UniProtKB/Swiss-Prot annotation:
Factors inducing expression: Expressed only in the forespore compartment of sporulating cells.
Family: Belongs to the SspI family.
Principal location: other
Location in or out of the cell: Spore core
Domain of life, source organism: Bacteria
InterPro entries per the UniProt record, alphabetical: SspI
Name assigned to this protein: Small, acid-soluble spore protein I
Organism: Bacillus anthracis
Pfam families membership: SSPI
One Gene Ontology term from the biological process aspect of the record: sporulation resulting in formation of a cellular spore
Chain's gene name: sspI
UniProt entry keywords in alphabetical sequence: Sporulation
């Protein structure tokens, strides 16, 4: 039996408001649980696919700077 994690995450947050999405993201990060990482990855994938080139560049700069700390 195959489990579609991407589909499950998207179904779970589909239709959420910005506040609900923020709560989901903050909760996942603050919990520090490894099991939350795939869900955050799916959300990042949505952001990346919907970002223009300038937004992608800005995200990469932010990521690069964050990894230097």
């Amino acid at each position: 039996m195959s489990f579609n994690l991407r589909g499950a995450v998207l179904a779970n947050v589909s239709g959420n408001t910005q506040d609900q999405l923020q709560e989901t993201i903050v909760d996942a990060i603050q919990s520090g649980e490894e099991k939350m990482l795939p869900g955050l990855g799916v959300l990042f994938e949505v952001i990346w696919k919907n970002a223009d080139e300038n937004e992608k560049h800005e995200m990469l700069e932010t990521l690069e700077q964050g990894l230097k700390k």
